């Protein structure tokens, strides 16, 4: 609970506020989650509880919803912005089958944190690799990574916001779990391992992914400052 409300409701209300024209659905695997959302008028699709990843769950849910293009905001991203959603849609305006967002790291502590996923991209803005480890890693600097080095180099945090074509979702759920995905516990690596591309946009919008109790405290502070509510 954050501010007396479940995090899921913060995310739901935020999306409705910043993207009111979206056909908004929630993929859930527990009637308690459905019942949490229903009083606010949010629609849910019940899915199996044994999916390997959130993307597998989205693939099942979209077989009910039937969207050609799916924007997936994970339930730990309560500060998603309208600009981020527009950026995702822009990335999907071309031939891309999947897209996601990243933002610059500001501190060495966050860059080292395994709960904050890193992404390295090629010159065309396509993901090369995602990792919980600090990447790129400065060989000649070793453990001497500081805030100044992080700010001066291409150190990007992956955000839990995706866009997919429906056909990519169908193909994703049919793929076996990849070896890298199993090691890092990062579902997007299944796409990389299969030889497919992920377009990555870099957002400057401030955001806090809530993955730990410390993140929840940071989000509560942002809400008190007026920067995190819907």
Spans of features found by a protein language model:
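N-terminal glycine-rich phosphate-binding loop and ensuing alpha1 helix
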Residues: 1-28
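Hydrophobic/aromatic residues located in beta-strands of well-ordered beta-sheets
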Residues: 24-26, 99, 127, 198
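Short phosphate-binding loop-to-helix
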Residues: 25, 31-90
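A conserved hydrophobic position in a structured secondary element of the catalytic/binding core
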Residues: 28-29, 80, 164, 211
């Amino acid at each position: 609970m954050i501010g007396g409300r479940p995090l899921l409701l913060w995310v739901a209300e935020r999306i409705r506020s910043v993207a009111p024209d979206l056909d908004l659905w929630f993929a859930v695997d527990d009637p308690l989650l459905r019942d949490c959302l229903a009083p606010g008028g949010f629609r849910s699709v019940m899915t199996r509880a044994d999916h390997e990843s959130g993307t597998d769950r989205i693939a099942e849910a979209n077989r009910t919803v039937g969207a050609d293009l799916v924007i997936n905001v994970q339930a730990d991203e309560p500060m998603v912005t309208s600009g981020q959603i527009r950026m995702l849609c822009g990335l999907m305006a071309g031939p891309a089958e999947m897209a996601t967002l990243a933002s610059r790291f500001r501190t060495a502590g966050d860059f080292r944190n395994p709960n904050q996923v890193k992404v390295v991209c090629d010159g065309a803005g396509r993901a090369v690799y995602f990792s919980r480890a600090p990447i790129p890693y400065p060989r000649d600097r070793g453990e001497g990574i500081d805030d100044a080095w992080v700010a001066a180099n291409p150190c990007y945090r992956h955000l839990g916001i995706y866009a997919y074509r429906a056909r990519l979702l169908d193909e994703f759920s049919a793929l076996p779990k990849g070896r890298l995905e199993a090691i890092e516990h990062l579902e997007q690596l299944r796409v990389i391992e299969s030889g497919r591309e992920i377009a990555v946009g870099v957002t400057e919008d401030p955001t806090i992914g809530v993955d730990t109790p410390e993140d929840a405290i940071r989000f509560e502070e942002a809400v008190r400052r007026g920067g995190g509510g819907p």
